[in-house]
Amino acid sequence: MALLTILRILLWGVVLFMEQRVQMAKPGWPSTALLADDPTLPSILDLAKEAPGKEMKQWPQGYPLRYMLKLYHRSADPHGHPRENRTIGAKMVRLVKPSANTVRPPRGSWHVQTLDFPLASNQVAYELIRATVVYRHQLHLVNYHLSCHVETWVPKCRTKHLPSSKSGSSKPSPMSKAWTEIDITHCIQQKLWNRKGRSVLRLRFMCQQQKGNETREFRWHGMTSLDVAFLLLYFNDTDDRVQGKLLARGQEELTDRESSFLMRSVRQACSIESDASCPSQEHDGSVNNQCSLHPYKVSFHQLGWDHWIIAPRLYTPNYCKGICTRVLPYGLNSPNHAIIQSLVNELVNHSVPQPSCVPYNFLPMSILLIETNGSILYKEYEGMIAQSCTCR
């Protein structure tokens, strides 16, 4: 009889809370029907998809790699945590190297290469927000000193030279004095990015011998196209992904209210029926065995991923372990289902398993990696580091 009374009170509590939910279904409150997909779930599988496999080309070297390493260290700490004061302005940056280059016959003191950059606009979850070309405006070689610039083969393309010390109005850029950067966002977005299939950005890299060197015959011998120019593409989350994160935060607020309401119902039921076999933490063992977060570190070398992940070297995913007590603590933010499941296990049917200790909140992680085609990618992956635990 006491058990039936407890369950009856709990069911009435659920009904009352659902009525409160209906009243809250007004502007300013996220609809629970839209909260099915939680975008903060761990994305380690998304990271694994980036693995280039054995067909990966040679490990990048030289200035492009140094550029991306400096960009990474400005945007993330040594553990891969995105810095709060980062100025990169994007969740993902891809360094694209030329897929082909053609040396043109010299015209007087001018020496020209054409560089082709492949563009794949299949980033469904991301939108292109910025595109720049970084190139060497000075070439100091043995017996040669050249001044260089780039031109696009895109009609009516507007470009904007960026100061060597900046990458935008107030964003520092990891550039040396011999390199400069131009903004070609308009060219890419308006002329090339929305085309079906693959597009190619073609640039002319033009260098002029300085006075006094014209008599010597200049050749591009020993210089790769990546030594003179590369393309940077900046991406951000689409509106749908941002909206999904806002909805997820609203879901957490609702879950906290639900858990608090149901836990009060449990205590009220037990106080009314004092002779009932109420759930108690006294039988749940040591407090040290309760569900909690445990630190853990692993290197990408141990995972076999160090041949394509440049930085960081270590990964601290953490893990959740412990007993989900019969009365779930409020601080665990357990959902209604876990609270009811725990009560059913204790009071009604022991064959129903108790909730499991699993991660609840996650932190993102910034990773610098090499793609199959040799491009270098900086990307912030959501849900990589467990920050807290819950019972579900």
Swiss-Prot record:
<feature type="glycosylation site" description="N-linked (GlcNAc...) asparagine">
    <location>
        <position position="213"/>
    </location>
</feature>
<dbReference type="InterPro" id="IPR029034">
    <property type="entry name" value="Cystine-knot_cytokine"/>
</dbReference>
<protein>
    <recommendedName>
        <fullName>Bone morphogenetic protein 15</fullName>
    </recommendedName>
</protein>
<comment type="function">
    <text>May be involved in follicular development. Oocyte-specific growth/differentiation factor that stimulates folliculogenesis and granulosa cell (GC) growth.</text>
</comment>
<keyword id="KW-0202">Cytokine</keyword>
<dbReference type="GO" id="GO:0005737">
    <property type="term" value="C:cytoplasm"/>
</dbReference>
<keyword id="KW-1015">Disulfide bond</keyword>
<keyword id="KW-0339">Growth factor</keyword>
<feature type="signal peptide">
    <location>
        <begin position="1"/>
        <end position="25"/>
    </location>
</feature>
<dbReference type="GO" id="GO:0008083">
    <property type="term" value="F:growth factor activity"/>
</dbReference>
<dbReference type="InterPro" id="IPR015615">
    <property type="entry name" value="TGF-beta-rel"/>
</dbReference>
<comment type="similarity">
    <text>Belongs to the TGF-beta family.</text>
</comment>
<dbReference type="InterPro" id="IPR017948">
    <property type="entry name" value="TGFb_CS"/>
</dbReference>
<keyword id="KW-0325">Glycoprotein</keyword>
<feature type="disulfide bond">
    <location>
        <begin position="324"/>
        <end position="391"/>
    </location>
</feature>
<feature type="disulfide bond">
    <location>
        <begin position="320"/>
        <end position="389"/>
    </location>
</feature>
<feature type="glycosylation site" description="N-linked (GlcNAc...) asparagine">
    <location>
        <position position="236"/>
    </location>
</feature>
<feature type="disulfide bond">
    <location>
        <begin position="291"/>
        <end position="357"/>
    </location>
</feature>
<dbReference type="GO" id="GO:0005125">
    <property type="term" value="F:cytokine activity"/>
</dbReference>
<comment type="subunit">
    <text>Homodimer. But, in contrast to other members of this family, cannot be disulfide-linked.</text>
</comment>
<feature type="glycosylation site" description="N-linked (GlcNAc...) asparagine">
    <location>
        <position position="373"/>
    </location>
</feature>
<dbReference type="Pfam" id="PF00019">
    <property type="entry name" value="TGF_beta"/>
</dbReference>
<dbReference type="GO" id="GO:0005615">
    <property type="term" value="C:extracellular space"/>
</dbReference>
<feature type="glycosylation site" description="N-linked (GlcNAc...) asparagine">
    <location>
        <position position="349"/>
    </location>
</feature>
<dbReference type="InterPro" id="IPR001839">
    <property type="entry name" value="TGF-b_C"/>
</dbReference>
<keyword id="KW-0732">Signal</keyword>
<dbReference type="GO" id="GO:0045893">
    <property type="term" value="P:positive regulation of DNA-templated transcription"/>
</dbReference>
<feature type="propeptide">
    <location>
        <begin position="26"/>
        <end position="267"/>
    </location>
</feature>
<feature type="glycosylation site" description="N-linked (GlcNAc...) asparagine">
    <location>
        <position position="85"/>
    </location>
</feature>
<keyword id="KW-0964">Secreted</keyword>
